[in-house]
């Protein structure tokens, strides 16, 4: 699940992605909701198209799918977010209530509560470290002292 509207996840190889704020490289028909990849020639169309993104005050795209993923997750990681905007601000709480281990990864400490672990440092280093820990040990223990990052339990 991503809140980003760019295509960086897709370019990095993510294939099972839910873009809850839409995708900038897609357009949506205002009346029918049809979504097309952009660029798409709509010059001859008499109908109105708009970017396939969520604007303030609009309902999040695919929220039902997001909730299914949150309640089925064994690990929930929030990476590079303030965690202050609803509904994403409740995702860690929802995942944790469903039994997931929750991890916050941010460049600076946020003071967020509700996470089992808070990793402080660059996501480019900490996400691979987290994935490696889960794959090699089957659990999340602590951050690597070799990189100078540490995992702090709430």
What are these model-predicted stretches?
Residues 1-154:
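Conserved catalytic alpha/beta core of Sir2/sirtuin-type deacylases, generalized to analogous enzyme cores
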